[in-house]
C-alpha cells in the first residue's frame, strides 16, 4: 500500500514539473534544437548558418539575392 501511494505522489510531482514549462516555450526550444524556424520571431537557429525560414522549416539562404531558395 505504501508503494502505491509513493508511486502516485511521484507521478503527480513529475506531471506538475512537466506542466511547469509552457507548451509554446517547449516547442520553441525543440525547434531551436533541431535547427528549424523559431515560432516567436520566425528566424532560424543562429548556429545553423546562413538560413532563412520558409514555413516551419529552414532553407539555405541565397547570399547573392538575400532570399530563400
UniProtKB/Swiss-Prot annotation:
<keyword id="KW-0027">Amidation</keyword>
<keyword id="KW-0960">Knottin</keyword>
<feature type="disulfide bond">
    <location>
        <begin position="37"/>
        <end position="53"/>
    </location>
</feature>
<dbReference type="Pfam" id="PF05980">
    <property type="entry name" value="Toxin_7"/>
</dbReference>
<keyword id="KW-0964">Secreted</keyword>
<keyword id="KW-1015">Disulfide bond</keyword>
<feature type="signal peptide">
    <location>
        <begin position="1"/>
        <end position="20"/>
    </location>
</feature>
<keyword id="KW-0528">Neurotoxin</keyword>
<comment type="similarity">
    <text>Belongs to the neurotoxin 01 (U2-agtx) family.</text>
</comment>
<feature type="propeptide">
    <location>
        <begin position="21"/>
        <end position="34"/>
    </location>
</feature>
<comment type="function">
    <text>Insect active toxin causing rapid but reversible paralysis in crickets. No activity shown in mammals. Does not show effect on mammalian voltage-gated calcium channels.</text>
</comment>
<keyword id="KW-0800">Toxin</keyword>
<dbReference type="GO" id="GO:0090729">
    <property type="term" value="F:toxin activity"/>
</dbReference>
<feature type="disulfide bond">
    <location>
        <begin position="52"/>
        <end position="68"/>
    </location>
</feature>
<dbReference type="GO" id="GO:0005576">
    <property type="term" value="C:extracellular region"/>
</dbReference>
<feature type="disulfide bond">
    <location>
        <begin position="44"/>
        <end position="58"/>
    </location>
</feature>
<keyword id="KW-0732">Signal</keyword>
<protein>
    <recommendedName>
        <fullName>U2-agatoxin-Ao1z</fullName>
    </recommendedName>
</protein>
Amino acid at each position: 500500500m505504501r508503494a502505491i501511494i509513493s508511486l502516485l505522489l511521484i507521478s503527480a510531482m513529475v506531471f506538475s514539473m512537466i506542466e511547469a514549462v509552457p507548451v509554446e516555450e517547449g516547442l520553441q526550444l525543440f525547434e531551436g534544437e533541431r535547427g528549424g524556424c523559431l515560432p516567436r520571431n520566425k528566424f532560424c537557429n543562429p548556429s545553423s548558418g546562413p538560413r532563412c525560414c520558409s514555413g516551419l522549416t529552414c532553407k539555405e539562404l541565397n547570399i547573392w539575392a538575400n532570399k530563400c531558395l
